[in-house]
């Protein structure tokens, strides 16, 4: 498994991303990644999507679309959060898929599971790829939900035990 990651590291362009949004306000992390701008200097508690995005701005989305990529968003939670519908339209996404885009999802602690999300991500990629010419690329921005709070939820089964550390 790790040899695959080692190979990816040797064969791809990669780096590190730092986000000034830690422990909440997920939309600010998205904003920083997609725009390259920092939220560190915004007023405390502000969310860029709700306050500052009122017109089209240059983003990773627009840059990739200028290079012939399709641009889709997959977010398996409700579309009503953080003014995302308006913002992602202004960012230039061709297609946005939300929790309400699907009849049923698999959940854990009330949130869509990563497994379900990744299966849909693969389906979306294959669908987008089939619709593209060979020289066109596919960009899909995927926001997962399973890692959101509620960690004390009583539906977890302890399946891994380490001797001497009970």
Residue locations for each model-derived region?
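Solvent-exposed soluble domains appended to multi-pass membrane proteins
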Residues: 1-166
């Amino acid at each position: 498994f790790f040899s695959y990651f080692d190979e990816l590291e040797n064969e791809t362009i990669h780096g590190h991303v730092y986000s000034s949004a830690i422990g909440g306000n997920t939309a600010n992390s998205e904003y920083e990644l997609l725009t390259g701008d920092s939220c560190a200097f915004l007023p405390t508690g502000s969310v860029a999507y709700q306050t500052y995005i009122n017109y089209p701005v240059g983003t990773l989305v627009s840059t990739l679309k200028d290079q012939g990529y399709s641009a889709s968003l997959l977010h398996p939670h409700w579309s009503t959060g953080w003014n995302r519908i308006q913002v992602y339209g202004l960012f230039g996404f061709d297609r946005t898929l939300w929790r309400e885009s699907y009849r049923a999802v698999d959940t854990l602690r009330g949130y869509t599971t990563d497994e379900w999300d990744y299966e849909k991500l693969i389906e979306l990629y294959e669908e987008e790829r089939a619709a593209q010419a060979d020289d066109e690329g596919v960009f899909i921005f995927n926001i997962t939900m399973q890692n959101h709070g509620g960690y004390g939820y009583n539906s977890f089964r302890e399946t891994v035990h380490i001797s001497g550390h009970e």
